[in-house]
UniProtKB/Swiss-Prot annotation:
Family: Belongs to the UPF0102 family.
Protein name: UPF0102 protein mma_0204
GO molecular function: nucleic acid binding
Top-rank lineage group of the source organism: Bacteria
A Pfam family this chain is assigned to: UPF0102
InterPro entries: Restrct_endonuc-II-like, tRNA_endonuc-like_dom_sf, UPF0102_YraN-like
Segment forming the signal sequence: none
NCBIfam families named among the record's database cross-references: PRK12497.1-3, YraN family protein
Amino acid sequence: MRLPAFLRPRTAKQLAGQAGEDQALIYLQQQGLQLLERNFRCKGGEIDLLMQDGKALVFVEVRMRSEKKFGGAAASIGTAKQKRLIIAAQIYLQRYSMPPPCRFDVIAFDDKEMTWLKNAIEA
């Protein structure tokens, strides 16, 4: 019998991803954004961080790569991943009768170097 996800030991990759999300969250809060929700999961996909930036709702994808091979962390967000992020955002926005202005940002870590890309995904 398979253990539920919350009881399974986390892999080194999962722990590194969690640490990256923690670092991204701290950085964004230092820039004045407020955390609304973390790891929003739905049938359509997952959004790492949901932040408020003034009146804008910001969907944040955090990506990590140990090297810049093949274009680095930001380039690893392919068309399929972008579509899943947009679907998850649409599901999240169903909570609002009048959805706020939104944008998709990416926090990319390439060998521990962090880059914040605002409006990285067009929707």
